[in-house]
Amino acid sequence: LAASSLLGDMLKKQRAEGRMIAAICAAPAVVLYPLGLLGDEKTSGYPAFQRRLDEANRTEERLRVGEKLITAAGPGVAMEFALALAEILKGKEKTTELAKAMLVEGSRCNA
């Protein structure tokens, strides 16, 4: 993904238009950072890749929901990441219904 100029162009356009970008695992460090798309935003990501980021961009949070950037640490956080995206796109009520239907306990939606 990091080598894809098509993806890079799409992400740069997304950022320029002020639209949301979401990335999980190594993607913040190996895709977004080299493209200059992080700005001064904190990002979570897979711990082994976080050291590639500037100190200002690093956080140890499992899930980081910023104004226009959502990042997650890795595969173990995938459900939290998905529910955070669902909440942004469809709202808390719909996301709570979804989490309950999927038997997801302890999510930020049904806490």
Regions found by a protein language model. Give the residues of each.
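Active-site-adjacent pocket-lining segments in enzyme domains
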Residues: 1-111
